[in-house]
């Protein structure tokens, strides 16, 4: 599911030609992407409209952080990752369009990257735990199968020896 979410984000945002794109064009793309993800995967993407309409164009960094925190409160790790990717892409592209000082949003982008790494770490840790748990269980199953086969073989060998009288 995570890869499909990220694909949806990148499809909507990377198909836009920055040189020909106005702020409104980009925000329309973001709106379409939010609609698509909202219909398909998540409930809280409508809160990203608040970020778009009120905060990104006015560069209100505090509100962007607060709204993002609210939007991600109940989201699964994969939805968080897609949202963070989406917001980072939009902010970077708006910086390119407006030719603003990239340092203005560097703090937000750094925070997003750090949060992405935490989410990725959580997903990897969960997968590692599940894999280890599965391997332990399947390893335990293999041992019990081998023991059962050995006992059955030993009993069959004993019955065969008894039947032959040797």
Curated annotation (Swiss-Prot):
Interacts with host BAX; this interaction inhibits apoptosis activation. Interacts with host BAK1. GO terms for cellular component: host cell membrane; host cell mitochondrion; membrane. Keywords: Host membrane, Host mitochondrion, Host-virus interaction, Membrane, Modulation of host cell apoptosis by virus, Transmembrane, Transmembrane helix. It is found in: Host mitochondrion; Host membrane. InterPro entries: Bcl-2-like_sf (IPR036834), Poxvirus_F1/C10 (IPR021119). Plays a role in the inhibition of mitochondria-mediated apoptosis by blocking the activation of mitochondria-tranlocalized BAX thereby maintaining pro-apoptotic BAX in an inactive conformation. Also inhibits apoptosis in a BAX-independent manner by interacting with and inhibiting host BAK1. The keyword Membrane applies. This is Apoptosis regulator M11L. Its main location: host cell. It is a single-pass membrane protein. It holds the Pfam family M11L. The keyword Metal-binding does not apply. The gene is m011L. The chain crosses the membrane at residues 138-160. One of its GO terms (biological process) is symbiont-mediated suppression of host apoptosis.
